[in-house]
Amino acid sequence: MKNVFQLLIPLFFHLFSLVSLQNIPVSTGTTRPKLKVGIAAAQKTQSASIGWNVCGGAVPLAIERLKQAGYVTNFDFEYYVEYTECDLASTVRTGINFLKNLEVDVIIGPPCSEAIRTMATLATLYKKPVLGWGFVSQADLSDMTRFPYLITVLPTSQTLGYAASKLLELYKWDKVALLYYKSEVNHCGGVMNDVETTFNDPSTYSIQIVLKAEIDASDNVTTNAVISSVKTRARIILWCAQLGSEKRDYMIKISQLGLDTDEYVHVLISMRSIGFGVQTFVGKTTFKLSGLTPVWESFSNVTDGLENVAKRGATNVLVIDLNSEVSDKAYLDYMQRNILNVVKLPPLNCSTVDCVSSTATGMGAYARHLFDVVYLYGIALTRVNSTDSAVYDDMSKLIPQFVTSFNGMTGLVAINQNLSRMPLYQLYGLDEQYEQTSLMNLSFADGTTVATISLAYSNESSAVWHFWGGIRPLATPICGFLGNSCPLPFWEQYGILIFVGAGVFLIMITTNLICFLFMIKNRREEQARINSEWQIPFVKLRELERKSKGTSKRSLQSAPSTITGESKVSTGSEFCENYEVKMFEKDMVLTMKFQYMNLNKADMDKFVKLRKLDHENLNKFIGLSIDSSQFISVTKLCSRGSLLDILYKGNFSMDFFFMYCIIKDVAEGMSYLHKSFLRLHGNLRSATCLVNDSWQVKLAEFGFDQLLEEITPTKRRLLWAAPEVLRGSLTVSQMDPSADVFSFAIIASEILTRKEAWDLKERKEGYDEIIYRVKKGGSFPIRPDIITDVPDVNPTLIALVKDCWAEAPEDRPTAENICEQLRDLMPKTKSNLMDHVFNMLEEYTSTLEVEVEERTKELTLEKKKADLLLSRMLPKQVAERLKAGQTVEPEGFDSVTVFFSDVVKFTILASKCTPFQVVNLLNDLYSNFDTIIEEHGVYKVESIGDGYLCVSGLPTRNGFNHIKQIVDMSLKFMDYCKNFKIPHLPRERVELRIGVNSGPCVAGVVGLSMPRYCLFGDTVNTASRMESNGKPSLIHLTSDAHLLLMKHFPHQYETNSRGEVIIKGKGVMETFWVLGRSGDIEPSISNRSTPPVTQERFTVRAPDTPEARSVSSHGSRPSSNHNNNNDPLYRQYKMDTLKI
């Protein structure tokens, strides 16, 4: 038929060459060039999309817009409108009349693919431009050889096919079904033909079309059958629909027919720049970004009740469409509101029945495309006219000017050399608020057919597939389209092969394995024997047994503060921080924990050698436990602790001989290490010099350099480090023995002065400055002051110490030289250190009584502090029984009132604050809340973050006053929040949500190490439900609490029934609001705060159903609850067991 009409074109040309059809010429001036515009329009064909009554107004609006932008200011226009209705015969007749008789300068339309081919062919004979709009996206229309003067603002549907192919390749979908709606202009059929052509292109991703079917919207039975047939053949469906009603019908069908599960993806392909929308209708809601009515809305003022069904179907739909971002949304809104009236006004003056008596309520679907193609013509016309004012119809000059770009009503319009639009497609989806969102761009470089994808998301699961359970659907289900092709279990498929292979493999390796086992048996036994010398199983290290334990599990006792009965080391010492005493083979040993690390053979050999080191001034290394989460070194116990503790924590005097013996022991141990395979200690400090019962110093923590490297040294430890170690940040393996000599000098200065290293209490410098100055060095480097109050100190010893901390390592004496000089300094009159110590202890006992008295005073003071703290943590009665070592039995209370509160939108408020500001805010708020609680005699159970739990009526019963105390306190809370100002957020307001319930409750103490006074019972849970189901700045009461309040305190409070509410775990409950005390209610506040009298019902659906994607009240659109207090763990904690 198409070829017949093309052959008849010359005949129609001669028949109508002398006929002048009736038209409406309009001129806006007589002195400027007047351009004749022929418009081939449609009124009855696809009227909602291309009807002249809903689209024609775009022409004068575009001309008006052009002139505002400085275009076509030198031209006037005459319009000739004929209605061809996309009929080929009418198109030929109208085309001949326009071109031959009226000699128009440009033709707009017709808006159909078949008709515009005819019009474009005629226009080629007369060399006149034809502006295409509407259903003119077929690929052959971009053929410059056939249609050199056809200009469209729609890309070819073939590019839509390449974009869809790229999307399928991205998501690895290789099987699709093609569905399209039947129409009189066969637009979707042509689009699907082009899509099928691109899918068959061997250069594109391999896609199998398993079904291609046409849908007749007028035949509901056939439509259901076609859509249902997809179930057994495909899960990815590409579909096309021209009308918004057809799109909505499709979404309803897939919901009703079960094609809306998480297995199906329905990809709508379109080139109308509207995505999930249709043109805005009066009284309809719109998308926030595009200003269009959501497609699932009813298209008439009378709803059909299927909006939610269509909306559910829309969640399984993705849309490939032209970019719908309009830069000038204000003008688009203006256009939508005025286009229906403009067509009836000059210069178009449409007076047909369709224009005058139109019932349309919105702009036509392709009106924006008509606007953009006229606007494009105006730009090209102005460009060629600006070059030569006398030339505006020379096609050789005019046509190249169409190759341009501008921001139109359909987004960015960019025309290529083929006079067709370079597409910028977008993939649209719906977010969790059912707002249209762009997921990716699919763009084409000029002259290419390969789409370039630019993703707009970083997490595909949450951005694209949130309605599919976060999982991308497969083109072919795992169990097949009929569910009967599920893969067999692994063992059923491969069990026999595995057993056979395993048997062959075992036979092959058995011989080799036996030989290999014999070879390694002796080696393992030898290695095990060697390792057993130093490796200690963790289970052999046992905790010390306490000599006394409390008889009551509720009693409060303090742990012992000493290691043994003879030790004088306090729990706060560095010795106790680093070491722990355990039992090993009936002996007490000293253990130290290190971070776990991988040990190589060299490390293990080192521990074997370390085990064999033995010297009277080295703390014997027994072994290392490596079979737990941490390494634990085991050495002999030195019960008197470290030298650091003895020097600073001891309160007995030391004479020169005592000092000399200690210094000599340190030097002897250091000298032995320097001669051993270790070469040096590397971590010599007064804290690593331990003292045993015989007052003999033993060096510890040597040989653990690999383990200690995992621990970052504190600034205090660096006070003993040599300058060269500080400068180079040397590890133990990089140090020289002279570094130990420097550390020895610092220890000797501590012993002589009995002050901490560098005497930081008396110095102005801190750790950082001293370390910096030691590292800096210089001619007069900083060193500790040696000022001792011991009268008989040998000056030679002081000189030796100063030699040991010389700046240059080579200037320091060796450890062996130090020992020789110390032997020469040995006092002749002294026998041994133990005799000397016994004499000193006799002197020490004289000061013991004074110390005991001072400690007794300190103990009394601390006991008062502990009692005060305990009274704030637990009720007074409970605290007294616990202090007495008595068991606190659970106690039941027949009637109490439980109070829950929560700060509304605390997460949003906290996000605007720094952590310190959040802490200060809660501290200011809760400090005043605590004052209010004390005023009303209410017991504060706990505060969890921004939540509060209080109770009245326990542990001291108060009759029925508990409901009054809680209500009064709640009102005081609300009054305080009204006047509470956040210093750093003066515009923000703190609002509370309060829930109250009255009933029986059980209270008792739970826990041993940290006892808590806990509440148990359904009354607590129900109070929590009241808070979570309450509203901001309102006090929510259960019916039990309300009845108690009204019965015992009538006419004192104003309340209002909220109605029946579905409470999780409780069913339907009638609840009440407390508005205030009688006579204190302001009308404005009452009207603002009191909810409607109408009954509310809330429904919470199970999270695994499609309906659970939102929680809403009747009549409201789905929304997400962003309240941070609805976290499940938080709610569970508050509802089940609430502790302080």
From Swiss-Prot:
Glycosylation sites: N220, N301, N349, N385, N418, N441, N459
Family statement: Belongs to the adenylyl cyclase class-4/guanylyl cyclase family.
Keywords from the UniProt entry: ATP-binding, Cell membrane, cGMP biosynthesis, Glycoprotein, GTP-binding, Lyase, Membrane, Nucleotide-binding, Receptor, Signal, Transmembrane, Transmembrane helix
Stretches assigned to the Cytoplasmic side: 517-1140
Residues annotated for ATP binding in this entry: L544, E545, R546, K547, S548, K549, G550, T551, S552, K582
Residue spans of biased composition, Low complexity class: 1109-1126
Biased composition (Polar residues): 1084-1097
Single GO BP term: cGMP biosynthetic process
One cellular-component annotation, GO: plasma membrane
Record's signal peptide: 1-21
PANTHER family registered for this protein in UniProt: GUANYLYL CYCLASE, RECEPTOR-TYPE GUANYLATE CYCLASE GCY-3
Protein name as it appears in the record: Receptor-type guanylate cyclase gcy-3
Primary role: Guanylate cyclase involved in the production of the second messenger cGMP.
SUPFAM superfamilies the UniProt entry points to: Nucleotide cyclase, Periplasmic binding protein-like I, Protein kinase-like (PK-like)
One protein family per Pfam: ANF_receptor
EC number annotated for this UniProt entry: 4.6.1.2
